[in-house]
Amino acid sequence: CYLSEDHMLGARENLRLLARMNRLSPHPCLQDRKDFGLPQEMVEGSQLQKDQAISVLHEMLQQCFNLFHIEHSSAAWNTTLLEQLCTGLQQQLEDLDACLGPVMGEKDSDMGRMGPILTVKKYFQDIHVYLKEKEYSDCAWEIIRVEMMRALSSSTTLQKRLRKMGGDLNSL
């Protein structure tokens, strides 16, 4: 399983798209800020084993895709940029699917992998609850856009770490 340079370029492009999706000055939204507790698994990949890292990356990208693919999302963003972001996230997921398949086949019920994944799911569940509580307001979406930039930036850092270790995720 190899994450190509194209995969890494796609990750950077997704960050650029998120930056371009900015519609509001962040100042009026400052009172809506919340610490969602970005999971350390997404930030500090050195504590993860190979199969955990792949699973965490996949789950984070899947949850991010799901977040921007909900009905309320299309009302908040430029449709073209949103579609490009979702397409880019989908491509990254497909790239990781090639890595995830063998890992899942080896230890499908491995609870060591489930802890970090559940942490990522809880993180995104908190984001969905926040959006609902804020009635999917423009400010709430702006807060989430910035949060997703942090999350995707962290995932890109983790992907770079994995790639530097020989470029082959299976050799970690």
From Swiss-Prot:
One of its GO terms (cellular component) is extracellular space. One of its GO terms (molecular function) is hormone activity. Glycans are attached at N78. Keywords: Antiviral defense, Cytokine, Disulfide bond, Glycoprotein, Hormone, Pregnancy, Secreted. Disulfide bonds join C1-C99, C29-C139. Constitutively and exclusively expressed in the mononuclear cells of the extraembryonic trophectoderm. One of its GO terms (biological process) is B cell activation involved in immune response. It comes from the Eukaryota. It is found in: Secreted. Pfam families: Interferon. Paracrine hormone primarily responsible for maternal recognition of pregnancy. Interacts with endometrial receptors, probably type I interferon receptors, and blocks estrogen receptor expression, preventing the estrogen-induced increase in oxytocin receptor expression in the endometrium. This results in the suppression of the pulsatile endometrial release of the luteolytic hormone prostaglandin F2-alpha, hindering the regression of the corpus luteum (luteolysis) and therefore a return to ovarian cyclicity. Belongs to the alpha/beta interferon family. IFN-alphaII subfamily. IFN-tau genes are intronless. They evolved from IFN-omega genes in the ruminantia suborder and have continued to duplicate independently in different lineages of the ruminantia. They code for proteins very similar in sequence but with different biological potency and pattern of expression. This is Interferon tau-3. The lineage of its organism: Eukaryota, Metazoa, Chordata, Craniata, Vertebrata.
